Amino acid sequence: PDPFAESAALPVKSTASELVQRLGGIAEETSFSGGRGHSAEEGTAYHAFLQYADLGGEAEAELARMRREGLLSEEQFALLDADRLNAILSLPVLRGLRGKRVLREQTFLVQLTAREAGLADTDDRIVFQGAVDLLAETEEGWLLVDYKLSSHSDEQLRRDYAPQIALYKKAVAAAMRVSEHTVRARILN
């Protein structure tokens, strides 16, 4: 057997979604297709709203501001429901971030070993890039929030996206130069 076969099969550079697929998880690009009753376009519209929303705001006021500022397309506005948006904005995880340092659509380019990424039992390095929906600095450390629009249960989402969340936690820890133990993650469905 070739002693370097495992290393030779590893990518040198990859997107986070490609690595998640290699780990057997669900790729980020499909996360908003959500299945029963949720289109990819609908998920993308909610994601865009959350990218620009004031976490302390009311949905109607935020929608009006976003329309004035041209932040969303008319097609996206048509897919959004103000009551649902108010319910999202009132979730404890988002309410708790008011006044905190919040980074949205935070891109990263990090280097991990294949072992750290869970891809192979080798210390060969892999560079990968991706984007975190929301990252907030809290008293306990960094909180990573990943948006999903799905009719699946929270437990099912945790199972389906465990490889992605684990990889993103490692990426945040590496990018922010903190211990991975200080990075928490939440899926917001």
Predicted regions, residues:
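Structural signature of nuclease core domains in nucleic-acid processing machines
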Residues: P1-N189
